[in-house]
Amino acid sequence: MGRRRRPRERDCAAQGARRHCRHLAECKLVSFPIGIYKVLRNVTDQIHLITLANNELKSLTSKFMTTFCQLQELHLEGNFLHSLPNEVSTLQHLKAIDLSRNQFHDFPEQLTTLPALETINLEENEIVDVPVEKLAAMPALRSINLRFNPLNAEVRVIAPPLIKFDMLMSPEDARASPP
């Protein structure tokens, strides 16, 4: 009898042989496993999507960012992250990042330096202020989700006339997390 692949592996395989993915979601990880660096050392430049969603990560190392510098999608939702290492700026091919349901109090401004970034999801964090001018200058940005963050009134007033992308925000009175 052949070995059955888990659904996550099957979904990834269906995306095509040219797109390499690594799914480590819901594994109760508190850090990125060092052994993974060794196992993947010859193919890191071919990995375009990593999912570390719904773990217990409190931080990511600079080594993670520099090792997987060819990433196009990074899913980190549902962790305990409060910042990103400066080396996130090495992810020059990154198109989408999901940082929803983490513990960011400050907008991770390093993301504004990524030329290919199209989608940022920061829903359900504790972000008050957003660098609207820097976001407006991002050439590829199409969407940023800031729903369920306690955004200050200034962001709500300044952002709309400056931006040319979709900026999702909760109504002013809906600052609490969703039910």
Locations of regions flagged by a protein language model:
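A contiguous pocket-lining binding segment that forms or flanks enzyme active sites
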Residues: N125
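Extended, charged alpha-helical interaction scaffolds
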Residues: D98-H105, L111-T113, L117-L122
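The feature captures the LRR N-terminal capping module
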Residues: M1-G78, S83-N86, A96, E109, ...
